[in-house]
Amino acid sequence: MSDDYYPWATAIRSDRMLGFQRLTILGATTLAFTPMLALADNARDWQNLPTDLNMVFGYYNRIDTNTPIDTSLPIDGLSLNANLYIARYARSFAIDGRNSAIQILQPYADISASFDNSRFFDGTKHNGGMADTQVVLVHNLFGGPALTKEEFANWTPETFMTGALWVTAPTGDYDKDRVINIGSNRWAFKPEIAFGTPIGPTWLELNGYVSLYGDNDDYQGNRTLEQKPLYGVEGHFSYTFNRALWASLDATYNRGGETRIDGDWQDNKQENALLGASMGFMLSPQFGGLIAYSDTVSERTGSADVNTWTLRLQYAW
């Protein structure tokens, strides 16, 4: 394969090509998901990549759930189908010798909703618009040194721990008189710790996070919505078939998030578990994607019951 096919490789000797091929597949699968809307990460999202790398992502998510688009807020009797599209940009850089990154996500949702008990309306309602913008700050704690593309080509992946802070701004479409909104009309912060270790051709990854919510003072009219933290942990066990293909088994567990409306606790603490699988692929050293599926296998009464298909395409340069 010529350097025209690997445009980053012009400064890398042919005996380093194997490492460079690893660079392209890792670089295009890192920092790669939409944990937006209380969804989980994907496998290999937080592995190391070279510094000064730009990445753009496009997502299509098909979601069937008993919640609004903000999946931290189940509503009794609700059945919602959503087509969620997300544009995402990420750039990596060095801080104090460790790899860091900043990401920006802008979702758009097209939804249809109905109620089994006609609690709020009859029939099916449709809505579409922009969801809340997210900014993500990422910094490696160990196992992810800041490396140029040439240095990364000769580097062997190692056990790592990375921290991230997700900030969700209330920029999405919101109407206080609607039952089902696309925006959440509140700030949210999600600190996250991601751990991963390579085991031969496999990766074992464990992530933990907590979602912290601001108040919504215009909830279903002029009521005030408060919510306790929602805690989550997830695991991924992935296998590398070759430099252009890997697959993963995924699991997620969430607990907490009880809400209070105008000072009255709603006795709706959430608890659910999801299982899924995913497959990442590369079509060229810069262009690739992912297909993923997850489904709720156990949930406490009143908790989120979510079924999600995800298609992601990404390009790195």
Where are these regions (language model features)?
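Repeated loop/turn-to-beta-strand initiation elements of outer-membrane beta-barrel proteins
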Residues: 66-67, 97-100, 144-145, 201-204, ...
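Residues on the lipid-exposed face of transmembrane beta-strands in outer-membrane beta-barrel proteins
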Residues: 58, 87-91, 135-141, 165, ...
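Transmembrane beta-strands of outer-membrane beta-barrel proteins
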Residues: 54-56, 100-104, 159-165, 189, ...
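Surface-exposed strand-loop-strand hairpins of Gram-negative outer-membrane beta-barrel proteins
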Residues: 63-84, 122-123, 176-180
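Outer-membrane beta-barrel pore domains and translocons
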Residues: 59-63, 105-109, 140, 166-170, ...
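Outer membrane beta-barrel transmembrane domains
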Residues: 220-317
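Outer-membrane pore/translocation modules
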Residues: 110-226
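Residues that define the transmembrane beta-barrel architecture of outer-membrane proteins
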Residues: 52, 79-85, 126-135, 159, ...
